């Protein structure tokens, strides 16, 4: 009798562990995506900031915002020139991603490197149903900004 009870408890424990691992794998976005990744579904994520897919700035921080349907997991990736892939951005061990709630908004901030920064934002219901948006941000150096200010000053003076 005791062996039968122990067997039931063991089977229940294994079932709970299996269900938890299935749930976790459905909600986890991949850490690395190939540069050629394409959307499998439309309109799961819409980039709001930056407003253009190619932009320039002299700021070292970039706010990112997007809209997505409730329940979509939004993740942000940075292109790694050494690997040729997009890697999920993390701060410490915490990935820049979130499941969108009833506000249907996602917001985050990334640090920019000098020169060209390539990003990808991914909105996914599951591993097979996702949309991606790629965008580039070029960080201009101070010397370049000073030259532009000088040209503008000369034009208007």
Model segments located where?
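Ser/Thr-rich low-complexity repeats and stalk/linker segments
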Residues: 2-12, 26-157
